């Protein structure tokens, strides 16, 4: 199907049922016809399962209403075993809290789909599934490919997951995925200057888990089809604000690769195993208060094939059909309060999106909520729109109040044709959207049609045209613009053609509008629009219609709805509740029948208006047609225009008809190619000769066979529309120059007439119009080698020519101003882009059959055309100029290489081939093809085409007849036959006598080739075994008796083999290790995913490298696995089919759960050569105990046992670890354990340790979002380069070209960068796994700014211990090592740490810095000499904590000063013990006894007789402040000494005894006390000493 035919078909198909749709209510979430008592329809062939939260029991069978299950756990257990006709019905009124429904790897079929719905009394309300993000609802999403710059994998919580499921219908459910800590309902939402001051709660973290209400995932390399969601209520899905293309929002369908593309072999495999969607329908549903998307369908990992070459933005039909989603319909839905976009279709082929309502979306796309602008996708959201779709249709939708363009939303439009091809918006209504009505977004948005829409009070503009591509056509819309808005947004700068629109300035004062902004792709062009209440109009609109008062044009413009209906239904367009009648034209309106007959730039046929009225004949202006009949004609064949009488100035309409005396056009032929409204007559009249009183060319009856008809037409009353001096011509009469074509309306005096003008000559130069495609001439080029010719629709903004790639195109020489003058000396201009193999052409389409003469315009005293017009040394490289008829090259010239040298070859070409026989619709092209190296490929050439007065040759039989063969299905081993079919004059015909048939490639090729009967043309074919699935096509040459010939093709489609048409799938099985786990295969059709039966004779065998404990039943394919280990175990299976003996591979996947397993770990783990490893920081002189290791890991489940074994013997808690010990997690009574071999690791290297998209547990990529703010992990990872990323470019990582990091990284540097546009910084962060002293080092040549182009502003590097700065330096010069920083790290890189401390290398960019990126590669190693012994095992402090809380609850006023002071001292000492992680059991007991004694020793205070105690007569007016806790890097070193001393188990010194400044603990370690610390703690010395607590511990608590 051609693009033109396809788009016409789309428009027709999408409009089907419009009258019905408009006449019926379209509630967005209407119940079924059995309102209040709806039940699901089930199929007797399947099983129905019932679930009731109120009346069920999971011990029931679940297969009757009287014995339903209680929980969805039972459904999830059998979900993958659901098959054709099976139903799962949830009882109305049920609530399934903290539950979910995940259906995977199964299918129904066309006759018996799987059904998920409700049963019972609908008055009880839809059954509710509320997953609330619980662990079971979580799954790991992974596209297995880069998807632009977006996040491509992560954990997602989904309430209803449909994964690789076909033929399934889900209906009548309420679905939520709520987070109790998030509260932001749209019904109470409002913008506030302070976040959350309106009572909302929001998690703005970029690392927040993604959530979905319903997710559809295609992942198995096949088509997931026939999925219907109907009558769902999805709300409160509290997903991630930022992530656009994870399963994150209300409803989201997306396709993944089944495997990563890692080699040429996998690339070939992926191209033939495409995960995609077909026939997805989402209807009658409400989606409210979800993040991020409302409804989205089609995002795909296969964008890497679709977008491999954006080209000019056009999308290849075959490409999108293969890799994109097809037959997608989104209809009658209501989306309100989505955090981001309302409804988006992505990578879809011709989807239809209709009767939907969007309301108050983009709730969180603002500067207060979207606080991490570097997160994927950016702070932009539109309403209802496509991304990279082919010919999508959006119609009968309403969009209200897309939010936040004034608060940071970079979009904010109702509609957005984004990076797509052929987008059609029609019959839509937008109101109050915060930015605009329509955006056509950027370079690769091409060929958009926007027609018969209404925009009312969209706030910052109506049309947003930022750098869009060409081919965009905006016509017959009505836009109502208030005081604060405008027609074009301020950023608009690119192409669109505006025709037949009504622009209304809704203010009380005439407005001067900016009608043109920018000139990209030719900028904006206007024709035949109406401008109401404007002080100016576009200069390009020569046919502008102006009006002062809108009430004289439309019945009530501005009165359309200002909000969505609460029900979510569309507003009525007809009937008593019609909401848009204010946009109907009033009687006598200038808009009525004032439109031009538009030829849609994108070939969409015009059928009806905004209200569903048919559009015929000459249309009205604006979006709504009146019922006033238009007598104006329309024609796609004949060009019309006006002639102006030079004397009177009167204008006469003319129609240009091509005929000569010997090649006439009859009245019948003319009338068959013009049309008008229903009820309009059309006829041709001839004016009588004034002198003779006879018709202007009266002939004798003998010479004119139709004279009787003529005479009859002259009888009185024969034609009331004929004027006195006119004769109505009979159908068979040839028309003449000066005849009148007249249209007249029944019952009225309304007429419209055109004088027929003979046109037989076309002159490229004279006919050229800037910005308007000529009726017959076109500027064209090929867009692919040997491909279709396409019209160049963009025009140069400065010169009179069409343009592509900035410099190339077709037009005329001179300036735009010179177009209005005499063009006698003007040349045609033809410029092809050198070297791309895609030629450029002046193209003329023949309006009639006949013979034409092509010549070139001549110029007196000038070089004969064609020639190169620009002086340049082309070094012998040339432009080839060809004359073509359709795709046939008649002749060529290759002598165009020298400036202003006429082409003798082309002159000879025209002399020999300039007289050309054409059929109507043939293309004559003058084609330029410049080879690589031509510096100035611009040609002067000015073609003129004239019909010769020759009778058209009698058509050859190959012209009169068409012959074809129907495509025929064939089966291997069975003969199929097909006959040749002839047509002539539009109908079936017998084969003409003497016709002969033969294959073009000669004789037959044996039994596996088709055989043709030479006399009848019948073709037979018996496919051989090797031709399963083949399409066998042969070219047939048909030779007629008159010597003419034609070619056609005969095609046989051989049925596929079982291997070709079937998928063999094993749904995933989950179970415990040590038990028999079983899975039987499922067979589905590759074409649509429908369930299929197992072909007879199919056998199964284990594939290569099957794991231990696996077996397969040879006959039925059941795989059994008894695994001794946990984890994911895959069993390869080879499936062999009986029909052709072909084998296919499948895989049974088992998620084996060990009875016990590692839960979480603060230490690094890995799998090395198939063995699990845990890395622990110990060495011979820095040991680590078993207890310390076990404290850093958890078991799953939490009650499982964990221990360390050596040679099979369990070690005691105090035993020191050794290499190859085994960390084991086990369950009582099980022989299966989860084991990790212990390995020592005491050195960490940022570069060597770096892992793509892995944070922790030792190294992290972090950032601050404000100066001196809290450090947080960076959630996003660059899609191409190996680094953590925020704000698109910045963060820490390693400097390498891609994610595939090599094993040897010695030549790779660490990399850190920070955004100069925001506060804070980025960090390479290391978390200490144990206490000790570490040495930080960097490479000898580091650090330095890694990129040229620094501008003198600084990137500040710091080495930090927790929040203390150890070293810092400013990097300002590109590629110059910072000696200051390197020396500081060498001097001060030894740092005493406690377990859990942070060492960070940070980068902070100065505002406005260029290239804020440095090379630095930190290495951190424990120093053996200063590594402390084992950390103390934590002791029980619960009793002491309770006693402290008891003391805090006492009131000082009740007790004597002396006893109270003793209590305070004991309480503070006890608090110090609580705060000390190293406190021993003895210290805890001592503190507990002392505090208990102090409580027991409290003495009650006697009653104070003085009710007015006197104030302190000598208060301290200037209390001494605490010393600065962070003096910064300029502080002088101090000796770290203090004036106090302490005794007990903790001493007043630590591993590092020397600090700096007033706080010696800055670099001296956490056990160091400073002078200021000691002085401040003097009052506590005695008690802390008595309690056995060192002074350092007290000081540490105060810090």
Swiss-Prot record:
Bias (Basic and acidic residues): 1494-1509
Effect of residue 387 to A: Greatly reduced catalytic activity toward pNP-LNB
PbH1 repeat coordinates: 165-190, 224-255, 277-299, 325-347, 348-388, 389-437, 469-506
Annotated knockout phenotype: Cells lacking this gene lose the ability to grow on LNT but continue to grow well on lactose and LNB.
Phenotype for residue 418 to A/N: Greatly reduced catalytic activity toward pNP-LNB
Other remarks on this protein: Breast-fed infants have gut microbiota that are substantially more rich in bifidobacteria compared with the mix-fed infants. Notably, B.longum was found to significantly dominate among members of the genus Bifidobacterium in the breast-fed infants.
Name by which UniProt lists this protein: Lacto-N-biosidase
Source organism of the structure: Bifidobacterium longum subsp. longum (strain ATCC 15707 / DSM 20219 / JCM 1217 / NCTC 11818 / E194b)
């Amino acid at each position: 199907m051609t693009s033109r035919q396809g788009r016409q078909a789309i428009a027709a198909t999408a409009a089907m049922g419009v009258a019905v749709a408009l006449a019926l209510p379209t509630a967005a979430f209407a119940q079924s016809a059995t309102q209040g008592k709806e039940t699901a329809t089930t199929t007797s062939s399947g099983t129905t399962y019932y679930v009731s939260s109120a009346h069920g029991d999971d011990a029931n069978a679940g297969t009757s209403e009287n014995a339903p299950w209680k929980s969805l756990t039972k459904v999830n257990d059998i979900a993958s075993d659901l098959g054709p006709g099976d139903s799962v019905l949830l009882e109305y009124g049920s609530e399934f809290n903290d539950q979910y429904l995940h259906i995977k790897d199964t299918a129904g079929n066309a006759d018996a789909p799987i059904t998920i719905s409700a049963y019972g009394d609908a008055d009880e309300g839809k059954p509710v599934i509320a997953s609330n993000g619980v662990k079971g609802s979580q799954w790991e999403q992974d596209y297995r490919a880069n998807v632009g710059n977006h996040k491509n994998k992560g954990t997602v919580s989904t309430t209803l997951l449909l994964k690789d499921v076909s033929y399934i219908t889900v209906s009548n459910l309420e679905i939520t995925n709520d987070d109790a800590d998030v509260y932001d309902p749209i019904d109470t939402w409002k913008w506030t200057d302070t976040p959350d001051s309106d009572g909302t709660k929001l998690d703005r973290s970029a690392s927040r888990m993604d959530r979905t209400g319903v997710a559809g995932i295609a992942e198995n390399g096949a088509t997931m089809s026939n999925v219907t969601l109907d009558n769902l209520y999805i709300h409160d899905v509290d997903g991630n604000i930022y992530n656009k293309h994870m399963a994150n929002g209300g409803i989201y369908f997306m396709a993944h690769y089944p495997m990563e593309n890692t080699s040429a072999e996998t690339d070939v495999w992926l191209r033939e195993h495409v995960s995609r969607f077909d026939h997805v329908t989402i209807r009658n549903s409400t989606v409210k208060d979800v993040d991020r998307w409302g409804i989205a369908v089609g995002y795909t990992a296969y964008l890497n094939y679709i977008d491999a070459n954006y080209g000019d933005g056009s999308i290849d039909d075959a490409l999108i059909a293969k890799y994109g989603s097809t037959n997608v319909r989104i209809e009658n839905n209501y989306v309100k309060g989505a955090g981001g976009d309302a409804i988006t279709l992505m990578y879809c082929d011709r989807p239809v999106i209709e009767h939907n309502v969007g309301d108050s979306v983009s709730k969180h796309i603002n500067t207060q909520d979207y606080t991490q602008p570097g997160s994927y996708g950016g702070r932009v959201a539109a309403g209802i729109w496509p991304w990279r779709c082919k010919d999508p249709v959006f119609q009968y939708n309403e969009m209200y109040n897309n939010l936040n363009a004034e608060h940071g939303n970079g979009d904010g439009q109702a509609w957005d044709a984004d990076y797509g091809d052929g987008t059609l918006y029609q019959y839509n209504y937008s109101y109050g959207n915060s930015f605009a009505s329509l955006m056509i977004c950027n370079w690769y948005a091409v060929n958009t049609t926007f027609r018969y829409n209404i925009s009312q009070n969209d706030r910052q503009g109506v049309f947003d045209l930022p750098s869009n591509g060409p081919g965009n056509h905006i016509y017959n819309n009505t836009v109502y613009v208030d005081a604060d808005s405008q027609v074009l947004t301020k950023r608009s700068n690119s192409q669109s053609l505006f025709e037949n629109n009504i622009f209304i300035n809704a203010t009380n004062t005439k407005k001067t509008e900016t009608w043109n902004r920018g000139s990209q792709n030719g900028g904006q062009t206007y024709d035949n629009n109406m401008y109401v209440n404007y002080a100016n109009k576009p200069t390009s609109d020569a046919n502008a219609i102006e009006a002062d008062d809108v009430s004289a044009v439309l019945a009530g413009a501005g009165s359309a709805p200002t909000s969505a209906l609460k029900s979510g239904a569309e507003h009525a367009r007809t009937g008593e509740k019609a909401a848009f009648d204010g946009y109907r034209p009033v009687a006598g309106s200038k808009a009525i029948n004032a439109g031009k007959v538009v030829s849609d730039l994108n070939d969409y046929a015009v059928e009806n208006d905004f209200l569903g009225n048919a559009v015929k004949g000459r249309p009205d202006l604006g979006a709504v047609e009146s019922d006033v009949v238009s007598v104006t004609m329309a024609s796609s064949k004949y060009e019309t225009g006006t002639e102006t009488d030079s004397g009177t100035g009167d204008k006469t309409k003319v129609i240009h008809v091509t005929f000569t005396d010997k090649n006439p056009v009859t009245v019948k032929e003319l009338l068959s190619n013009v049309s008008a409204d229903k009820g309009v007559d059309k006829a041709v009249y001839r004016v009588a000769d004034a002198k003779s009183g006879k018709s202007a060319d009266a002939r004798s009856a003998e010479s004119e066979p139709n004279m009787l008809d003529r005479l009859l037409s002259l009888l009185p009353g024969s034609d009331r529309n004929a004027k006195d001096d006119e004769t109505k011509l009979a159908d068979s009469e040839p028309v003449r120059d000066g005849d009148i074509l007249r249209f007249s309306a029944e019952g009225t005096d309304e007429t419209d007439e055109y004088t027929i003008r003979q046109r037989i000559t076309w002159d490229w130069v004279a006919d050229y119009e800037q910005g308007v495609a000529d009726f017959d001439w076109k500027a064209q080029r090929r867009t692919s080698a040997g491909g279709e010719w396409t019209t160049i629709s963009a025009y140069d903004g400065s010169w009179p020519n069409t343009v592509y790639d900035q410099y190339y195109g077709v037009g005329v020489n001179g300036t735009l101003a010179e177009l209005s003058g005499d063009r006698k000396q003007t040349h045609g201009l033809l410029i092809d882009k050198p070297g791309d193999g895609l030629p450029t052409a002046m193209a003329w389409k023949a309006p009639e059959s006949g013979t034409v003469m092509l010549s070139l315009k001549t110029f007196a005293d000038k070089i004969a055309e064609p020639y190169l017009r620009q002086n340049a040394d082309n070094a012998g490289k040339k432009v080839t100029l060809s004359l073509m008829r359709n795709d046939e090259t008649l002749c060529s010239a290759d002598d165009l290489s020298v400036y202003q040298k006429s082409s003798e070859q082309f002159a000879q070409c025209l002399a020999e081939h300039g007289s050309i026989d054409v059929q109507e619709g043939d293309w004559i092209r003058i084609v330029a093809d410049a080879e690589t190296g031509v510096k100035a490929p611009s040609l002067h050439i000015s073609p003129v085409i004239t019909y010769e007065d020759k009778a058209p040759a009698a058509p050859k039989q190959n012209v009169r007849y068409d012959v074809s063969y129907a495509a025929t299905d064939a089966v291997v081993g069975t003969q199929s036959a097909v006959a040749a079919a002839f047509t002539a004059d539009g109908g079936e015909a017998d084969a003409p006598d003497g016709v002969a048939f033969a294959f073009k490639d000669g004789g037959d090729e044996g039994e596996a080739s088709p055989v043709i009967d030479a006399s009848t043309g019948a073709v037979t074919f018996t496919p051989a075994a090797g031709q399963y699935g083949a399409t066998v096509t042969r070219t047939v040459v048909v030779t007629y008796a008159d010597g003419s010939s034609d070619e056609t093709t005969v095609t046989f489609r051989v049925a596929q083999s079982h291997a070709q048409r079937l998928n063999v799938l094993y749904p995933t099985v989950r179970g415990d290790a040590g038990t028999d786990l079983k899975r039987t295969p499922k067979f589905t059709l590759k074409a649509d995913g429908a369930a299929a039966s197992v072909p007879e004779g199919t056998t199964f065998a284990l594939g290569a490298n099957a794991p231990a404990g696996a077996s397969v039943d040879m006959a039925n394919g059941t795989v059994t696995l008894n695994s001794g280990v946990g984890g994911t175990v895959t069993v390869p299976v080879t499936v062999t089919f009986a029909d052709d003996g072909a084998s296919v591979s499948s895989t049974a996947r088992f998620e084996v759960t060990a009875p016990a397993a590692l839960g979480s770990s603060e230490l690094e783990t890995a799998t090395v050569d198939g063995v699990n490893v845990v890395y622990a920081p110990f060495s011979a002189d820095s040991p680590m105990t078993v207890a310390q290791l076990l404290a850093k890991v958890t078991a799953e489940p939490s009650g499982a046992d964990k221990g360390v074994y050596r040679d099979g013997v369990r070690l005691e808690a105090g035993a020191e670890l050794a290499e190859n010990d085994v960390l084991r997690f086990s369950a009582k009574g099980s022989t299966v354990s989860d084991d990790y071999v212990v390995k020592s690791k005491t050195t960490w290297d940022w570069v060597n340790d770096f892992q793509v998209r892995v944070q922790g547990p030792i190294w992290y990529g972090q950032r601050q979002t404000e100066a001196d703010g809290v450090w947080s992990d960076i959630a996003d990872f660059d899609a191409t380069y190996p680094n953590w990323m925020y704000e698109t470019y910045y963060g820490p990582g390693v400097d390498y070209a891609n994610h595939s990091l090599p094993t040897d990284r010695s030549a790779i540097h660490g990399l850190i960068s920070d955004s100069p546009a925001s506060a804070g910084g980025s960090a390479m962060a290391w978390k200490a796994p144990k206490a000790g002293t570490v040495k930080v080092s960097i490479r000898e040549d580091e650090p330095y700014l890694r990129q040229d182009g620094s501008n003198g502003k600084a990137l500040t590097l710091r080495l930090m211990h927790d929040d203390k700065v150890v070293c810092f330096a400013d990097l300002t010069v590109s590629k110059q090592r910072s000696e200051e920083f390197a020396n500081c790290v060498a001097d001060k890189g030894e740092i005493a740490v406690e377990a859990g401390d942070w060492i960070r290398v940070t980068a902070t960019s100065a505002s406005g810095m260029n290239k804020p990126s440095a090379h630095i590669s930190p290495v951190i190693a424990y120093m053996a000499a200063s590594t402390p012994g084992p950390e103390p095992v934590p002791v029980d402090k619960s009793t002491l904590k309770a006693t402290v809380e008891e003391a805090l609850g006492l009131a000082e006023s009740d007790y004597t000063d002396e006893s109270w002071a003793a209590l305070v001292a004991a309480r503070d000492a006890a608090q110090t013990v609580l705060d000390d992680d190293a406190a021993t059991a003895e210290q805890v007991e001592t503190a507990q006894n002392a505090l208990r004694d102090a409580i027991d020793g409290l003495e009650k205070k006697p009653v104070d007789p003085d009710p007015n105690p006197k104030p302190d007569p000598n208060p301290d007016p200037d209390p001494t402040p605490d010393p600065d806790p962070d003096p910064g890097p300029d502080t002088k070193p101090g000796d770290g000494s203090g004036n106090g001393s302490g005794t007990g188990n903790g001493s007043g010194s630590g591993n590092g005894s020397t600090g700096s400044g007033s706080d010696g603990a800055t670099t001296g370690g956490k056990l160091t006390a400073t002078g200021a610390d000691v002085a401040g703690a003097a009052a506590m010395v005695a008690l802390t000493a008595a309690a056995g607590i060192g002074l350092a511990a007290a000081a540490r608590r105060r810090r």
